[in-house]
Each structure stands twice: as structure tokens, then as C-alpha cells.
């Protein structure tokens, strides 16, 4: 018996010790919660008062309560219920706050509370400070409190939280009202959530699955837990921020529908105004919209939006922000919207923006930044005026060229094989490369008839309208659409400052909304004769050859037997005219007049491998083979690389890597990184100068293939000097023009979406007729706008040791078309090129068609 009594005494002692420690723990929890709500100083005062009152209450209890009274047990029961309830509540709050045993889900940390983060739009700016694009998951640009209209603040407080300035995050009176409404069945008691609680929910996503614990999935209990989190977070927000800061965060966080987040974007999207310019009725519309962005959307449901706006106005009257007369007057007004919703590819420079996005995403992956959520400010290199000029030039000249192309083919199909015969299965073959075909083939794997049916099924669609540079509605099938788009010529243009590498204009196509493929960097096509300068640079710069522009090579047929991939081949290029002078010709003249035979002979002398080496040194990054025809540009290159490589000539032989972005700032305006281009000496300064003179000869001297830019466009102001090189590939599949000035290197490419789509005659399809007009029109606009000042190339600061002043004798300007794999069959002569002085207007630019 004594053993049993001892055992029970031990258990009682342990229980008392546990109860004592539990009481201490509960006291600590209660103290922390009280500190959280009231602050440490106030909590100390309360707990000191509590201890004194507790002692006094105990003394009073012992002196006045009769333990034998019939009321003693009920009083004790009530008292214990209160005490245990408080203890249970304290334990519950502790578990929620600490996510005890992962039951309750996470709470925002102190760092989260002090530096709340919302997804912000990243903005792209031009070199002259104009914003040209925003990229985001949520289109949001925060504004400070001073840029928020007082009308918005009044409307929000009157509608959502009338006692906002009198509570500390939780409106107990409103909560009691809601509770009473639940008991009585009343439905007009409001929601009870304060503005601060709503902000807590929006900022920290307290109801998302990631914030739930194990108990969060229990019906009813889950609601209680996330509500508790919002209460606790609201209290913390009130302790960390002023009322103005809370309102500012709220307005910058709210979703206003139509992928519009924050009051700044909402004001601009719905009313084309800054948020500090919103009047009462506009403010009421936006505050009312917060309740349900679909139901009360003024675009989708004007009637419901108007009703909701008037509810907000009535609340403003109720709480004294408006007089009854003002409220009645405003309520009678209609909602007048002036919508302008932003998309990432609004405006111009869309191909450039896409290139910037690719660059920043890669940079962000390496540096821990997200383009779509971190509110970056990205400062780019393009000049807004030059970009506009470039797009206008592209639109104007391609519209004219497309008219010529349509007239040229009339009712015939333009897809032709190398012999000029129509490719009869062209569209059925091409359609198999489309996503539409792949989707249908997957849906009907063994049913080609069904695939064909849906490909030829007509429906209303919106397509690109090249005649008006816009869009048009057509009742077409997918095959009709493919047929239409394949007939449209494509183009790209890029302009770069050769000294800084800064890209000043980038036009990757006709319209980004319809032609996503970027002809500047993504597109790679044969450069034709624009590749020839690499041959001449090799001959002049490489000390093994040490040639000069006045050295001569006989213009005669060239033939080369060589081996490629184990197979013996014979290459016999022909001149574009199909004729030869059989006389010595200077390198200067040969390049200016784009003589294929001389280039082929020079390539043979310097070696194809050396030409490849120099092309790589100067910036060509695509694969090149050391074959005899390398000098005539048989391998695909990008316009981007070609512009960079030609920049070497204008930058004293130094290759400067093209750059798109100069610096990136964070959302607070702090510079994260500044970008500088790579520089390397590719060729000597003297070689660069000599090549520049040779390129000038192509523009300035008789017979030069680029000469038309001087008399067709006003680009020689102020003694302006240009160097240029045209290029045209076999069958006129590609037209190129590369132009060098003292401040800009500009390149353009024109061709069909497929190489089999082209002009039949060099007279219409050569680079001088397709690509050169785009560059000429661009430079004319740039000089007219005074984006840059025209002028001569700077004189060399060093002695020129080689002879270069051997002007080309007068000769008819030849085409630059290549017959890379052809024989010496004469080509059709371009009659228009016979006129070098005062030539007649070229139909390409002067024809007027409706």
C-alpha cells in the first residue's frame, strides 16, 4: 500500500511540475501575443497589472467566497472555462504563428512584412528615354501615395472600411456585426474585413495552397485558419507601416481585371489618365470594380458597373465625403471610358523588343532576376526616331516592291525550281511544316481525308494586309491563308553605330503580329556578293599577300576543280553580264562593279581557308566551308553578323560587338549592371581605310553597283560619304545591301519566305532594286530628321603606305547577281543600269497602283 501511495505522490508531483511549466509556457505565449498586438512596453505594463490584480483577486476570493456555498462550483466552472478558453486561444494563435508540426501552414516572415513584394512590370526604354514596352505576369507599375487621387482614397474607405483610421488592423465592431448577422440571418452586415486584412490577403496569398498546412484542408477549420492568418498579418502590417503606406500598397496591389494590376495601370487602361487625375465618378468605378472584376467590369457589363459605381458614391455620401446634391449629380452621369490596354508588343520596335527579352531572360537566369516580376528598368541602345524612320522606310519600300512582285507573277504561282518550273506540290509540302497540320495529323492519325477537309474548310480570319500595312478580314481556309502568305516577300534591316556597337534601329520583318520570324538575327540566308569584301580584305590585310586596291587581275572565265566530301567537283562561275573584258582590272574596280571572275581568281590566290578565317575574325559566326566559291557568299549568314562585320571597315579595323542594352536598374532605380561591348582588332587601321575607299567606289564611281543610292535618295548632304555593296544570290532568291557611313552601318535583306519564291529576272530581283531602296529611304529620313549629321569619313591619322587612288573608268553598272553553280551562259542584260547620269525613274518606286 505504501508503494502505491508513493507512486501516486510521484505522479502528482510530476503533474504539478508539468502544470507549472505549462503555465510558464502559456504565460510566455500570452506575453508574445500581447507584445505583437500592443507592443513590448504596453505588454509589460499589462502583465505587471495582471500579476497585481491576480494576487488581489486571490485574496478577495479566499476572504469572501464560501467553498460550501451552492454557487461555488458553478462559479469555479465558469472561471475555469474562461481560463482554459484563453489558454486554448493562446495555444491556437501560437500554433498558427509557428506552423506547429506543419499543421497550420506558413506565415509571412519579418523580412516579408518589412519588404513586401508584388510582381511588377519590367519596362524597356530607348536611348532617348522613351518607354517602348512592358513585360509582366501582372501588368503593374507602382506609384507613391502623392500620385493617388484623394477621390480614390475617400471612395475606398467609404466603401470598404469606414473606421480605417480608427482601428489597428482588425475592426472588432465590424466583426461583431457580421457575427450577429450570421446568427440573425441578416445579409447586409458587410464582410468585416478591413483594408489592412484585404492587403494581407493580396500581398501574402494566405489562401493559396502553398500557405496551407495539414489542417488547412479540413472544411471549416481551413477557413478559420486563413482568416486568423489575415488577422495576425494585418496587425503586423499596422505595426510596420503608416496608414498612408498601407493605402499605397493596397492601391498598387489590387487586380482591376483585363490583366490590369495596380491603380496606375488601371487609371491608364480604363480612362487614359494618371491616377492622381481621376475624378470622383472615375474613382468610384475603379473602387467598385475591386469587388468583382468580371461582374462589375465597365467594358463587359456597363449596367452592373454603373450600379456598383452608384453604390460607392452613396457610401461616400453616407460618410460625409460628398453632399447629397453632389452624390445625386454624379450618380446621374454615364460612365465615360477611354480605354487603352497595354500589351508587351504595342507600338514599334517589336522585333527589337523580342531580342531584348531574350537577352534579359538569359541575363536574369544568370543573376537571379525575373523579367516578368521584378520591375526592372531596361535601357536599350535604339534611337526612337531612327527606329520609326526604319519602320517607315521598310513599310514604304516593301509595299512598292510587293506591288511589282504581284504584277510580275500576275496569275502564276511564284514558287519555282532552279530551272524556272513551277513546284506543283509546293503548298501540300509546306503545309506539313505548320502547327495546324501537325495538330490535325495527331487528331486524325490514319485519316488524311479528314486532315485535308479541315485544312480546306473556310472560316472568317484576320490576315495581314500588305497593301495598307494593316489587317483585313477574309473568308478563307488554312490553305488559302498559306497560299496568300507565301506570296508576300520578307525583309529585315539593322543599323548600328560602328564605334560603340550600339544598335540604333532593328526591323526584323513587316509586322511582328503576323511574321514572328526575325530576319535580322534568326534569319540566315546566302549573302551573295556582299560577302566579297572579306576576300578583298584578306588580300590587302594579310601580310602574306600584301595586295593593294590598285593591283590588277585579268577579267576572264574562271574554272576550278576541287574535292568536297570525297567527291570531285568543278566550279565555273560566270559574271552577271555573261561577258568578260579579258583585260586587267583593278581590285577596286572589280569590287565596285562586283565582277565575279576577278573575285573567284582572287579567292584562289589567297586561299578559301584564309577568307573563312578573316570572315570569322570580323564577326561572322555561322558555319563556313573553305570551298572555292566562298567569296561569292554561298553559305547562310545573318544580317546581324554582316552589319557587325562591315562595322570593322568604319571603325579603324576594330570589331565591336553589337549591343542592345546599356544598363539594367531594379525597381528602386538602383543600377544592377551596365553593359559594354566586346572590342578586338580584326584588321589593321590601314586595311580598314583601304576597304572603305573600295566600298565608296561602289557608290561614287562609274559602274558601281551601289551608285543608285546617290541619285535616288537625298543622302549626300553636307558632303556626306557612303560606302556600299549590293548582293544577289542565284535565281534572285536573296537581295542584300550593306551601307557604311561615318556614324552608321546599315544592312538590309529582302527575299521570299522560301528560297524558291523570287523574281524571275535580275532586273527586278537584284539587291540594288530590292534591299538598297530600304536603306536609302532610311538614311534619307534620318538625315532629314537630323537624328545624326551627315558628313565625310574622317581622314586617317596615320600614313597610308599602299596605293588606292586608281578611280574606276566609266562603265555600265552591272548587276551583282551570282551564278554560283552555273556555267557561262549569258545572262539577260539590265538595260536600266546603262544610265548612270540622270537615269530615268525606276518603276519600282514611282508606279502608282490602286
Where are these regions (language model features)?
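N-terminal type II signal-anchor transmembrane helix
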Residues: 2-125, 163, 183, 401
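Short, well-structured active-site flanking segments
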Residues: 165-175, 261-264, 323-328, 541-565, ...
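Active-site loop and adjoining helix of the penicillin-binding protein/serine DD-peptidase-beta-lactamase fold
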Residues: 230, 234, 238, 290-308, ...
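Conserved catalytic neighborhood of penicillin-recognizing serine enzymes
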Residues: 184-211, 276, 340-351, 546-611, ...
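A penicillin-recognizing enzyme superfamily signal
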Residues: 380, 384-400, 431-497, 502, ...
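Residue-level preference for non-acidic, small/hydrophobic
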Residues: 129, 156, 199, 246, ...
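Non-catalytic structural connector segments
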Residues: 188, 323-381, 385-446, 579
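Peptidoglycan glycan-strand catalytic modules in the bacterial/periplasmic cell-wall system
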Residues: 2, 6-9, 16, 27, ...
